[in-house]
Amino acid sequence: MSNYDRVPCSIAIPNQQVEIQQQPRVFEDQESPVKTKVQQPPPEQVRVPPTVIGATATAKKKSCLSTTSSRKEPPAHPALRRKTVAFGRTVNVSQTVEGTSRHTKKAIASPSQNHRMTEENQEENWRDVMKNEFEVMRKEMQEEATKKQEELNAQNLNKMQEMMSQFFQQITVAKPSAEESQDREKENWYEQSRHARQQKPANKIAKAREIIKREGSIPPEALPILEQRIRTDPMFRQQIDNVLADAECDANRAAYSPLPPLSPPSGRYANGSSGNPALMRETLTVERSIRYDNGLSSIDSRQWTSERNDNRTHDNYRPYEPDPQLQSMYQKGQSVSYYPSEAVGKAHRNNRLEYHVEEVPEYEEEETEVGGRGRGRKYHEPMETESAAERERRIREKYSRRK
């Protein structure tokens, strides 16, 4: 007995045989003629509803349009399927009524859908569990780090307090008595004397350095100190090398530097306040003026100077000792002057290939000029004077030629 028999106000329709005649169709849009024979339904039968129990009263009601009869399977061939118009186009009846109802689709898809939903729910639950675990672990780690930092801060604070207390104890020390101050002054004096004694070797080294730089040799009293410092101090070894190199450079520079004058300066120019000795160079004798090589000295003077420089090469490293003053060999009426020759090809004065000798007699030497533009010219010779008229005439002729 079906459930519809128990439900009140239900219509029970017996199974009726329906004949369906189907024919193959040429066009799909045209439906084949169907002849259906329907039997007349029997008269309605009203049944008294039985006693309803709690389970049947709470049962879910089904639609009155649903049927308990099994549906007929649609034909396999698409040409034999029934056609209808749905949603503006022609579709198979099986797609709308027979095989595509929501109930059928839901019944077919429910197992897989339930399984998929179950898996998704399990994954979401697993994510929630992991998230909660991570949150708990993170909070625990933060609490541990905070606790360690607080302990470290407390230790640092204690140490700082101890240091400050010790510092204040050192500051608040009682003032020493007079006896202690005297003892401390004595200790300071002894320390200063000891420090001075320790500084003495440094002073010796400084003196030895000056001697090395001046004489180019190491004094014997400085050798033990230098040996000890050289063995123990690499920087001192470098300093010694630098000092020796400087001494060698100074010696080489002194070898090529010009030598001082042979005779000491006179008392007139000793203080340097009365005048410049260079301005009085013309008054010096030949022997004293050999150091002033200005191109005007004679041949024998230059030769004697070069020979003397060659002979003094062994005196470069000895302190300078002035030579004894030489007496002038000048004799009146016996002087000979050498001048460059200008007769051959108008040679320059510095061209010393040819020279000529001019002998001046004794009675004319007093009337000869010593320097200036008129060297060698006699005073008794008349000077050629030009009057103003001659000068004007010469200038007029000069400009008339240019025109």
Swiss-Prot record:
Keyword Transmembrane helix: no
Keywords (A to Z) from UniProt: Cell cycle, Coiled coil, Cytoplasm, Cytoskeleton, Developmental protein
Short name of one Pfam family: Sas-5-like_implico
Compositional bias annotation for Basic and acidic residues: 116-127, 177-194, 305-321, 379-403
Residue ranges the record marks as coiled coil: 128-163
Assigned GO CC terms: centriole; cytoplasm
Region ranges (Disordered): 24-79, 96-127, 174-205, 255-276, 302-325, 355-403
Cellular compartments annotated: Cytoplasm; Cytoplasm, Cytoskeleton, Microtubule organizing center, Centrosome, Centriole
Gene Ontology biological process terms in this record: centriole replication
Skewed-composition ranges (Acidic residues): 360-369
Quaternary structure, from the entry: Interacts with sas-6 via its coiled coil domain.
Task performed by this protein: Required for centrosome duplication. Essential for daughter-centriole formation. Requires both maternal and partenal expression, suggesting that it regulates centriole duplication during both spermatogenesis and early embryogenesis.
Protein name, as recorded: Spindle assembly abnormal protein 5
Organism of this sequence: Caenorhabditis briggsae
Taxonomic path: Eukaryota, Metazoa, Ecdysozoa, Nematoda, Chromadorea
UniProt gene name: sas-5
